[in-house]
Amino acid sequence: MTIGLGHYLAVGAILFTLGILGIFLNRKNIIVILMSVELILLAVNINLVAFSAFLGDIVGQVFALLVLTVAAAEAAIGLAVLVVYFRNRGSIAVEDVNLMKG
């Protein structure tokens, strides 16, 4: 049995669904929401690489590397902002962040 395009798309769909569920089911912790967004981006990357390999075109793989770079920068900046916010406020609950003005 060979691993085909359908298998990669199924894994990507499962990861994407888990990321969406993580966002909708846990709205209290910002770190979990950030990790869920990263999971969604990982699912998109898996689909890009799978379609790229299936079609024999390298553009999807290059775009996946670009998305991976942007996702890493987004995670680093997001975690840095959360650390600074936690040091100032003492909490990272979504309700507390919604009260932030200005």
UniProtKB/Swiss-Prot annotation:
- Which InterPro entries is this protein grouped with? NADH_UbQ_OxRdtase_chain4L/K, NUOK/Mnh_C1-like
Q: Name one GO molecular function term.
A: NADH:ubiquinone reductase (non-electrogenic) activity
Primary location class: membrane
Say what the protein does: NDH-1 shuttles electrons from NADH, via FMN and iron-sulfur (Fe-S) centers, to quinones in the respiratory chain. The immediate electron acceptor for the enzyme in this species is believed to be ubiquinone. Couples the redox reaction to proton translocation (for every two electrons transferred, four hydrogen ions are translocated across the cytoplasmic membrane), and thus conserves the redox energy in a proton gradient.
Quaternary structure per UniProt? NDH-1 is composed of 14 different subunits. Subunits NuoA, H, J, K, L, M, N constitute the membrane sector of the complex.
Instruction: Write the protein's name.
Output: NADH-quinone oxidoreductase subunit K
**Where is it located?**
Cell inner membrane
Write down the HAMAP family for this protein, in alphabetical order.
NDH1_NuoK
Q: Name one GO cellular component term.
A: plasma membrane
Entry-linked Pfam families? Oxidored_q2
| One example of a Gene Ontology biological process annotation | ATP synthesis coupled electron transport
Amino-acid biosynthesis: is it a keyword of this entry?
no
Q: Which family does it belong to?
A: Belongs to the complex I subunit 4L family.
Q: Topology in the membrane?
A: Multi-pass membrane protein
**Does the record's keyword annotation contain Transport?**
yes
Database matches in PANTHER family: NADH DEHYDROGENASE SUBUNIT 4L-RELATED, NADH-UBIQUINONE OXIDOREDUCTASE SUBUNIT ND4L
The enzyme's E.C. designation:
7.1.1.-
